[in-house]
Amino acid sequence: MRHGPPGRGADEKPKNIKSSMLELLRYLKPWYKPIVISLIFSLVGTLLTIIAPDKLADLTNNISDGLQTGIDMDLIIKSILIILAIYISANLVTCAASYIMITVMQKLAWSMRTSISQKINKLPLKFFDKVTVGDVLSRITNDVDTISSALNSSITTLVQAVVQFVGVTIIMFATSGRLALTAIGSSILGFVLMFFIVSRSRKYFRQQQQNLGDMNGHVEEMYSGHNIVRAYGATAQSKKEFDRINDNLYNSAWKSQFFSGMLMPLMGFVGNLGYVAVCIVGATLTMSGAIRFGTVIAFISYVKLFTNPLSQISQAVSSLMSAGAAGERVFGFLAEEEMPDDSGCTAHIDHVRGKVEFENVRFGYDEDKPIIHDFSADIEPGQKVAIVGYTGAGKTTMVNLLMRFYELWSGQIKIDGVPVSEMRRSDVHAMFGMVLQDTWLFDGTYRENIAYGKPGVTDEQVEAACKLVGLDHYIKTLPKGYDTELNDRSSLSAGQRQLLTIARAMVENAPMIILDEATSSVDTRTEVLVQKAMDRLARGRTSFIIAHRLSTIRDADLILVMDKGDIVESGTHEQLLGKGGLYKELYTSQFENK
């Protein structure tokens, strides 16, 4: 199956609905052939529908003439069969066109979601610092579905409506110029209304998609942090923000749907007005002998065929506006700046020893606000290194730079003498196991969660890791043991979740380990269990520990004390206490009341 075209550079983001529609056309290029076939079928179905009233007029005239001279049943039956054949054929080719278009649009949705998924893996971490999860989810689900359904309902409809409108107009004038002018004159109002409604609804569709993304982002944040919201008594504040976003979504959705919903009843009114006008003028012309009765019957059908395209065109344009608004958000996401290409990075370490060097590292999240000013440190293989400091000192930032989640402003980070900037990011990531403060588990079995990211792991390896962290007995008491499903309803404590992620890191068996405040979310009793598990995990590996509780890093081989992006002290626990500097201040503040 074909993938859609890749996203463009950040300087080429769609600026408006028009450009996003052009981008959609480019994205549809792999399916031009089936789309053309679908449109041809639609054209055939439309043309058959257009000629049917003419055959109906012949049938009416034959019956009308036969009332005086005798009805020719063979001719009547033949006319009926022809009309049935026309309508059946028109429906068959129209169904075929719909089938093809639905298939294409589902492939388009699949391709877009695939492109978004691939894009997520290429985005730098700084993108996720500024965008909510809910907004990204909204683009993957709501916006892509809007594009797919809107294009599916509008492309063939628009073509059919235009062809039907032009074809019926030609046939009406060829049949009776005066009745044609009557039908068109009564429909001019429809054109005016359509132009007004489409011009007014465009901006509201754009606002609706944006507000929907804001809503998803807020709900996701409040759901994931509902305990914090309650604990801080911020329920009213959260509700106030929800009400604000909900009001914005309500207003934009109401306005867009109101203008869109006006089309059908207004077009229905125009159609009924056309029926009345045609009947009055047609009756006058029939009585004067200018036209036959069958022509009036045909024109009543033509009025419907003439006015329907107006409402269909309006609805199709409205759907295209909705697709364009959703396309702006999707293509804006796909056009986000990606991480620099590292395919040219050929450096590789066959056997990782674990020596790490930071050389005059300088970095910041904002161009004019450096966080790490001039960081240098040497870590020997197998050392247990703790990084401590006040909140905002740059501890986690250093680990993110080590993992090459961000690119340095200047300086170098080396692993076994090789700069990480010369290695592929995936190779750098494979060198580290991570246990973070915020545990991440997914819907799946315990076994699948523990073996995550490590193909070919045996059941014995999974169970051995769980025995080392003290989880094996608990898991085996579950109804299905290691095959028990883990989900939001699973009653795992914070400590058990942390032990599970430590077991995952053990199974991964990476040569270096990063422990980012892994005990900060557990109670003191559980901390002992988690600490023992982490000690087993770090044994024989170079390990980096970002510590909040300094009691957990007293046995570290090297403690780096950071303040405002620089190392201000380094040494062992005893050495740093003896210096009486920042480390002693941090340590004393935690234990002075104990």
List the predicted regions and their residue ranges.
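Helix-loop-helix
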Residues: 66-67, 72-74, 171-185, 255-328, ...
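Juxtamembrane loop-to-helix connectors within ABC transporter transmembrane domains
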Residues: 20, 28, 60, 101-105, ...
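Short intracellular "coupling" helices and adjacent cytoplasmic loop segments at the cytosolic face
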Residues: 3-12, 106, 114-138, 142-144, ...
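An intracellular "coupling" helix at the cytosolic face of ABC transporter transmembrane type-1 domains
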Residues: 125-126, 142-151, 155, 200-221, ...
